[in-house]
Amino acid sequence: MMTALLLNWRQAAGYTILAPTVEVAANAFNPARDMVRRDDDLDDLCQVQTHIRTITHRVTDTTLKVVAADPNTVSGIKSVGTLIDELWLFGKQYKAEDMLREAIGGLASRPEGFVVYTTTQSNEPPAGVFRQKLQYARDVRDGKIHDPHFLPVIFEHPPEMVESGV
């Protein structure tokens, strides 16, 4: 998301990392913050506001904001790019589907807009929005669904390996 922030051409664009918990939000924000602080050029170009988990490009006024998912923090987001982090945890949350729909709703008016879903695997079977997105990604990967705007990058152990318990 830092690359998107730096290469963005739209004045005052917004980028969002949506995390399912405060802990995951901190894990997403801290490396970006440290990247800026440890590079003199980036430090000159970007302002880091740790208390609101926001990095602002000083020239374009573009922001990268990391938010912990809550219906109150997600409403009204108008991002050009959104990264949904740890989707499997959203799968356990009540009304997560509505919250994610609200978070990416602003993309309709931005032709260059994008959404990235990232996750690790749960110890439990996939559930909720995680299960839905995982199945959709598998169907695109396997050619059951044609969606040229959706690129699934999935690492899964081969079914025979999972079944054997190796």
Q: Each predicted region: which residue ranges?
A:
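Phosphate/NTP-binding elements of NTP-utilizing enzymes
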Residues: 1-166
